[in-house]
Amino acid sequence: MSGGVAQGAPRVGSIFGSRHLWRRLDEVQRLDRGRRLLENLHRTVVRLPTGGHNEAMTAILGLNAYHGDAAAALVIDGELVAAVEEERFTRIKHCAGFPALAAAWCLTEAGIGPAELDNIAISRDSRANAGHKLWWVIRHGANGRYLKARLANAARVRDVRSTFAGATGIEPEALRAKLHHVEHHQAHVASAFFVSPFEHAAVLSVDGFGDFTSMMLAQGEGSSFRVLDRVLFPHSLGMFYTALTQWLGFPKYGEEGKVMGLASYGDPCFLERMRELVVLDGDLFRLSLEYFAHEDGVDMTWHGQTPTIGRLFSDRLVETFGPPREPRSEITAQHENVAASLQAMLEDAYLHVVRMLWERTRIPNLCLAGGVALNAIANGRVLPETPFDELFIQPAAGDAGTAVGAAFWVWNQHLGRPRSFVMNHAYTGPAYSEAECAAAIASAGLEGERLDDDRLFAEIAERISMGDIVGWFQGRMEFGPRALGNRSILVDPRRAEIKDILNARVKHREPFRPFAPSILAEATAEWYEQDYPSPFMLLVYKTRAGKRERIPAVNHVDDTGRLQTVERRVNPRYWRLIKEFEKLTGVPLVLNTSFNESEPIVMTPQHAVETFTKTEMDILVLGNHVVRSGAACRVASEAVASAGVARP
């Protein structure tokens, strides 16, 4: 963003000068690690610039609130300035509720106050599809408790203006921003098309549900899109996948990705049974509702910190596939085969709709969003198996991304402003200075060394090649569920044993889940059967036959990888590290997994230090500061001594 943002910054007090936000932060303080969060936010306030509001500037705050993956995004004059999930602050995965801390950080990052916002957009509109909702209630009745919960959630959404004012410490009357309720799937569509590189595109949004819709098909032209079709409640590919995910013993919100990994171990021998659950009906699809419970009302909690969803499958599904697996119990061949069949059915239905969308638009460009668009296996089949030539997937394809979409819906669709922004990276979160990194290391009682770039990249590439586990913390944090080289744990992909070591010492996750490669973009065609850019780790490609044995740690059981292609112009530091590794090993890729252990991806240097100290990583890199532990420290010291180089 241009310097106009800093020039238009207000006084510090205009953002944080009241008791209301600090009362909210006091609530966070009662959470684990809340003290450090408060320290970080207080420190951020001190850094705010001063000045007056730039009257020519148009500032739009987008919110995903009262739903899983609560998030905020700030768009100023058509440019995405900041976007971040609430979970990164609260340290609660998929944090629901109102994203007060995420919104406050976005404003702080831009140096503006809540009173200077022109528009606030929330990716929910309880009025959307009102006629369909009423007709459904008349025909089916409604579970009283379920209906009460949905009405309460709708009331919270409608009251977002006063909630935001209270959270940010101003009177509602002082909030001059116009409030926009953007239909959930229109926000998804906007999040994909308006930030894509395409002037014209077909757009598909697929998830569980939002505003009574589970799928939206649209056509984007310039600075607007038109809705072509939609699938309404109770039919939903996302709900189908989540229901079977629950049956497979993964009941927590957001565990569908585990099933995608498990599916590769099974045989889709139950595919014909799955076709009884999902019927490809003409252009779209429908569910056989006797296998599901959500039509009758399922308890869902969105207003607290942790989102929850009640049981979505019916007794009929249990009769078909047997008793559901208990969480953390043994996974059998039956479970693997059901997972494989579930994934195959999802892919068939997904591609069926994609092909139909091409027939209706005949546009070569496709944009994808919605939680189902996080299914990288299905995405990887789109270009080879449909007529589309080009593809853009919103990096935060799940509901967090609707914060971005809601803001751009206002800028482009509502205000009619021309498009000027392309989301070619997802590094939109907080960044920290070298001094802050050093302070975090010192406050933990650790010894760190600051290296210049040449020494840093050479040493870390060498340590990775020698089998060390490296925590890599650089620049602005990623937005969305994937670590893309700024909040990552990196290891050598050539070592088959490193997966088990990584799980035992750091990640502690299920052994069937694959680890992903980050590869130099220019080397993709040499190592994988497809080479279309995959910057957000949302495409699965087959590994070339001659390369599989060389990178066993990132070659899944079905000879695939969910890869991130790394371009020098997008992330030069990450690209350089991988390039140094290639010089040492001849392999232009590293294993990249998210920098966390059973919690959200680390945001601050303090989070990174804490994860480093409670796990068994070998090296922590915060900017140019290196912390070595145990054997890694001894090996580094011996290398320095043998080279005759004095340690600073």
Residue locations for each model-derived region?
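Extreme N-terminal starter segment of soluble prokaryotic enzymes
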Residues: 57-60
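Adenine-nucleotide phosphate-binding core of ATP-dependent small-molecule kinases
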Residues: 327-353
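Short glycine-rich phosphate-binding loop at a beta-alpha junction
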Residues: 114-125, 179, 362-370
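Intrinsic low-complexity, disordered N-terminal segments enriched in polar/charged/small residues
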Residues: 27, 38-40
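Flexible beta->alpha loop and helix N-cap segments adjacent to enzyme active/binding sites
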Residues: 66-85, 90-93, 136, 143-146, ...
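N-terminal phosphate-binding loop and adjacent alpha-helix
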Residues: 88-112, 350
